[in-house]
Amino acid sequence: MADVKRVYTFGNKEAEGNGKMRELLGGKGANLAEMNLIGIPVPPGFTITTEVCSEYYAHGKDAVIQMLRPEVEKAMKNIEKLTGMKFGDKEMPLLVSVRSGARASMPGMMDTILNLGMNDQAVEAVAKRTGNPRFAWDSYRRFVQMYGVVVLGMKPESKEDHDPFEVIIEEQKHKRGVKNDTDLTTDDLKELVRNFKAAVKKQTGEDFPACPWDQLWGAVCAVFGSWMNDRAILYRKLNNIPAEWGTAVTVQAMVFGNMGSNSATGVAFSRDAATGENLFNGEYLINAQGEDVVAGIRTPQQITLEGSKRWAAAQNISEEDRRTKYPSLEEVMPVVYKELDEIQHHLEQYFKDMQDIEFTIQDGKLWMLQCRNGKRTGAAMVKIAMDMLREGLIDERTAVLRCEPAKLDELLHPVFDKKAITNAQVITKGLPASPGAATGPVVFFAEDAEKTLAQTGQKAILVRIETSPEDLKGMLDAAGILTARGGMTSHAAVVARGMGKCCVSGAGELEIDYKTRTIKVNGFTVKEGDWISLNGSTGEVYLGQVATMAADLSGDFGQLMDLAGKYAVLKVRANADTPKDAAQAFGFGAEGIGLCRTEHMFFEGDRIKAFREMILADDEAGRRVALAKLLPIQRSDFEGLFKAMNGFPVTVRLLDPPLHEFVPHDEKGQKEMAREMNVPLQKIVAKVESLAEFNPMLGHRGCRLGNTYPEITEMQARAIIEAAMNVRAQGTPVHVEIMVPLVGNHKELRYQKGIIDSTAEQVFSERNDKIDYMVGTMIEVPRAAVTANQIAEVAEFFSFGTNDLTQMTLGFSRDDIGKFLPIYLDKGILKNDPFQILDQNGVGQLIREAVFKGRGKRPMLKCGICGEHGGEPTSVEFCHYAGLNYVSCSPFRVPIARLAAAHAALKEK
């Protein structure tokens, strides 16, 4: 191990580190150093660097202790010098805290130990020095309990068991006939310490360590060890924090909030973390230590008078009771409060962000223990950024970068009422496929969702094992969708996001019985008509009806979007199949439609009947008769899209799915189709069997359909061109792009383009008029990417269909990946779900290669993506660096993509 500096001291307005050293000192250590340097009262201490955490896992506990010992002993002497106390001394013992601190905030995920250095001699010395034996023994029992849990592993043996120390405390309170910990006497606390030690001896076979240095090394190594505990690992996964970052450890002289009625501890925020309101707020406890505030053992009180009054009103507590039982810190300690208010304002002005601060008041003296940029909701994030911009605290670029694109989701969808959700019964959990909140009666079939809405005006929750395009109308009419199978990019998930519809997919615990129309899950039975609620942001499914409220899009949101548009280079379009989708996307700032899936148009009303006539036709003439019925319908649909986009580009993808998706596969559905079509059932059965494929995703679909049945391409091309000309004739500008799907060979595209061009020329001749249009292709077959130079000879634009391109490049089925994806993620084989976050090293390199080769042949070639990755922030950033012109995503992801595009441009500068 290299001879480098591993320990950095701070105290008395001096520090060896500073706020810019987050990677080395962690967020806590860096900010403690910085607070010292700007004159904030901070107890002295030292920080062991994050690099030591990596060394701990590489070389082990003993090697790290041996390596650290000289620097730590020297740093401890610095604390002793500044405090006038000595670590391990019997007369003036120095007590310290040991805390974690990664470079990214991970509140509550790792371990903390307070009052370290306590033993049988130190407790008597503290009691004598302070004249407060109860405080001394209370601090001792807290230390034994914390150390026992964190370092010695004295935790419940099973989820049914209680904390062994809490059991002992409850027994002591019961024995004494008291309710609160604060009611225990000094003698009671002495007895608790004896009983705690006995419990440690019984469970571990060892005496509780009395040597302060042994205690310290045990605590330091335990904090390093907590970097890899289950909750820390999960938190890192959820927040994309790399495991290799490690945590720092900060050792700090103790200050005590539990010395009596003139002492306290608390947590505060410089602004409201839930709403973003510019209101100093927080909670505190008299005669307590920091862990008490977050543990919920006692009811904390509000810091400010205004906050206290708001809290009391919400709790239906009278002003008299509030003032006498729950007074604010502002009322109880006005001088200390004034200093705290000045410090929080100073810190916010200094760090230029909303601050989360921890403090302790020891015998009337205020000490700051931590400050960090506070966690906040999506709504608060936007409001705080825009407010600080207006206040002149930050500039436009900082305001944009301060807002996380993914958190905008919280602003765009309905949300559950916070009070209602706390009392809701969770029955299972799936994947949070599409954000939002939905509640309604259960139905199992798409047509029943339609009937429920038509007959009662109530939207239902559509519950399916999995969905298909045939369920589209039911999905549209449902309040939300719940599926037992499918991942984040399954049909249900993709379509739901496009609709802005709440969806929970892949809830594998569900036992769905279509015959009895019931769900069995975790001991609950839910019948058709019973109410359930879905949380599309967490994947949780609740029994019964949970109250929801509409998302509130304030003026701050619009201002943020304007700023995003100002700085972004990458354009953002929407995947939209209907004028309603297009209008929604346009409202969110989409600059065109990057993908219109024409097949979705065929499932509404009588359209499916005409399309099935085409499928059943025995020859081309029969197919053309059926297609003639579809022509005016398609033309009308396209007119609506062109009008909604008002001159922005509209990319229409020609028919893509295999024909088997348009026919029923169950006996009941086939009989119904035979009756509606007035043909023998056997003909339906035979046609369905003839359309079946072993691997339809790689089968007779996309351009292969258009090349074998060119009349389909002719009809769609005519509908598109005629619609564009009709809309332009009404005074609305149009920008038409026709996209051929699933091209793997430039000859396939050349054949399709020939059909499109000849059809367009025919329409131009009939109308004695012309209109500009472009023909391009969807790059979703790997061969298309590597032969992009040949394809660019024909294509006027590329749109990367990253859903299928990911499937074909990785060899993963997006509908079946759920069977092994969790294992691959756990083992580190995959870092992310490749259908959610673009595989930049594999699929991404194909995209780069295709763009390079395509523009080598056609320099002004327009390139974009239209897969679900188009709304994922890191994938959008990749698209910016890869030189794409636009991304296209679901309407409700448009704001996220716009903000991500602005981030990419600003980071590049």
Question: What is each stretch, according to the model?
Answer:
Residues 99-100, 553, 563-909:
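Conserved alpha/beta-domain cores
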